[in-house]
Curated annotation (Swiss-Prot):
The keyword Iron-sulfur does not apply. Its EC number is 2.4.2.29. This is Queuine tRNA-ribosyltransferase. GO terms for molecular function: metal ion binding; tRNA-guanosine(34) queuine transglycosylase activity. Catalyzes the base-exchange of a guanine (G) residue with the queuine precursor 7-aminomethyl-7-deazaguanine (PreQ1) at position 34 (anticodon wobble position) in tRNAs with GU(N) anticodons (tRNA-Asp, -Asn, -His and -Tyr). Catalysis occurs through a double-displacement mechanism. The nucleophile active site attacks the C1' of nucleotide 34 to detach the guanine base from the RNA, forming a covalent enzyme-RNA intermediate. The proton acceptor active site deprotonates the incoming PreQ1, allowing a nucleophilic attack on the C1' of the ribose to form the product. It comes from the Bacteria. Belongs to the queuine tRNA-ribosyltransferase family. The gene is tgt. It comes from Clostridium acetobutylicum (strain ATCC 824 / DSM 792 / JCM 1419 / IAM 19013 / LMG 5710 / NBRC 13948 / NRRL B-527 / VKM B-1787 / 2291 / W). Binds 1 zinc ion per subunit. InterPro entries: ArchSynthase1/Queuine_TRR (IPR050076), TGT (IPR004803), TGT-like_sf (IPR036511), tRNA_ribo_trans-like (IPR002616).
């Protein structure tokens, strides 16, 4: 259940109660595609850096180790030793972005695995079954994520099919939640708004899915080729037409600046591979913007990544040491940077919540954007 604790303009401060614990919003979900954060970050590490929600991938876990294996081992929470909320995406984005030789039909999608080429079928029912086997806290509806830009006629047909798929997802998850051998009988379902860069299609779709009794609503199909200005315009168009008593999730976004802009437009949930991916390449976030620790200028820099940061990395290691680790190709370099970046994001969200509580979010946002000046 979502409780709107405070609203100032469009900015929302909320609390989302789940079977696996309470989520304070706005929140950033830390992406562990295969039930682990790339960069040797464990579930215990995630707790230390104040992660509220972990996000795992339905498509990838269905291939390795297999959702049936995870179910036999007690579900994703037991499998990865994590007792806080987990959101699993539906697999739709990966099917449409990674898989080869796709055939989209009303029943679902036929495609070849990006790992071994074997033929696979996934539709709404299959996606729900996999997510039920994984026993995540929140399941995402199976949808088609179209590229931006795509022809209007195709987007209209795709959105209509995505709506029909959502109805099937809800019916199937309701059925699965009632079965005696289901691990998480209180698994939640979020629907996904699509429509490419066409505001009117987006709005109509938002109105349609808002009539369904879902646990939350996501805005999908962004950060896939459109400009930041287009993304913000679409958020502005869609959010007013989604239920205001449910969480709103902007999928796959984004930079710290993107997050601040989206929070100011009424978004509650975020996820992105960016902080971990950047960290693995030595790009780290600071209060003054992003820096590249591989640069020679950090060779003798004994200061932490970000002065005043309380993450495990900044409390114990210097920029010079981490640069040395990258140059020596030591795996520890990636781990230390990923830990820092995820802590930076999680702390940013905590600071955002505190700013909303203190009625100073707009000042906080402007101060951050000015300090980063396009560098975050």
């Amino acid at each position: 259940m979502y409780t709107l604790l405070k609203k100032t303009g469009k900015v929302r401060r909320g609390r989302f109660e789940t079977v696996h614990g309470t989520i304070e919003t706005p929140v950033f979900m830390n992406v562990g595609t295969l039930a682990a954060i790339k960069g040797a970050v464990s579930s215990m590490d995630l707790k230390e850096i104040n992660c509220q929600v972990e996000l795992s991938n339905t498509y990838h876990l269905s291939l390795r180790p297999g959702d049936d294996v995870v179910k036999k081992l007690g579900g994703l929470h037991k499998f990865m030793n994590w007792d806080r909320p987990i959101l699993t995406d539906s697999g739709g984005f990966q099917v449409f972005s990674l898989a080869e030789i796709r055939k989209i039909k009303e029943e679902g999608v036929y495609f070849n695995s990006h790992i071994d080429g074997r033929k696979i079928f996934m539709g709404p029912e299959e996606s729900m079954k996999i997510q039920s086997n994984l026993a995540s806290t929140i399941a995402m509806a199976f949808d088609e994520c179209v590229e931006n830009p795509s022809p209007r006629e195709y987007v209209e047909r795709s959105v209509e099919r995505t709506t029909r798929w959502l109805v099937r997802c809800k019916e199937e998850l309701d059925r699965l939640n009632s079965l005696p051998d289901t691990i998480n009988k209180k698994q939640m379902l979020f629907g996904i708004n699509q429509g490419g860069v066409y505001d009117d299609i987006r709005i109509e779709h938002a109105k349609t899915i808002a009539k369904m009794d879902l646990d939350g609503y996501a805005i999908g199909g962004l950060a896939v080729g459109e400009t930041h200005e287009e993304m913000y315009r679409i958020i502005d168009a869609v959010v007013p037409h989604l239920p205001q008593d449910k969480p709103i999730y902007l999928m796959g976004v984004g930079t710290p600046s993107n997050i601040l802009e989206a929070v100011s437009r009424g978004v509650d949930f975020f996820d992105c591979v960016l902080p971990a991916r950047n960290g693995r390449h030595g790009h780290v976030f600071t209060k003054h913007g992003k820096i590249n620790l591989r640069n020679e200028k950090f060779e003798l820099d004994a200061s932490p990544i970000d002065e005043g940061c309380q993450c495990p990395t900044c409390k114990h290691y210097s920029r010079a040491y981490i640069r040395h680790l990258f140059k020596a190709k030591e795996m520890l370099a990636m781990r230390l940077c990923v830990l820092h970046n995820l802590y930076f994001y999680n702390t940013l969200m905590e600071d955002i919540r505190n700013a909303i509580d203190a009625d100073c979010f707009e000042e906080f946002k402007n101060e951050k954007l000015k300090a980063w000046a396009g560098k975050a």
